[in-house]
């Protein structure tokens, strides 16, 4: 009887451990959505932290990412570029916009790159 109870206690402990590990895993899409929420409210530093966290979570072998994960990563870099422009950090913004374009080339990324490059060239002239 004691052996039976001991096995059940170990089983329950292992199940709890698995649930705790799964609960602690990070969800990049959740960080992207939270960053978007912060950005909409003008909380730029918080938004930047969330977008950078998405990048950190996907910092491993990107050849193993699924299509939707590439989209999340690309959007995080694009939104990070936008947040940097709002802070006036144009060089960082350009770097992130280019990174976003490399991951997920689209019209929005390209247009943002062009706008940032124009802003930087105006700043050097003026």
State the predicted function of each range.
Residues 23-40:
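Bacterial Sec signal peptide processing site at the extreme N-terminus
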Residues 57-70, 106:
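Flexible helix-coil transition and linker loops at the boundaries of alpha-helical arrays
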């Amino acid at each position: 009887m004691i052996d039976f109870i001991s096995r059940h206690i170990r089983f329950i402990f292992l199940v709890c451990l698995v649930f705790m590990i799964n609960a602690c895993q990070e969800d990049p899409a959740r960080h992207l959505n939270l960053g978007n929420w912060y950005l909409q409210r003008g909380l730029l530093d918080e938004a930047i932290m969330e977008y950078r966290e998405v990048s950190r979570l996907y910092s491993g072998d990107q050849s193993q990412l699924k299509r939707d994960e590439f989209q999340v990563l690309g959007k995080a870099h694009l939104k990070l570029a936008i947040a940097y422009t709002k802070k006036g950090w144009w060089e960082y913004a350009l770097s992130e916009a280019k990174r976003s374009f490399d991951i997920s080339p689209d019209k929005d990324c390209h247009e943002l790159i062009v706008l940032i490059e124009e802003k930087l060239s105006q700043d050097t002239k003026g």
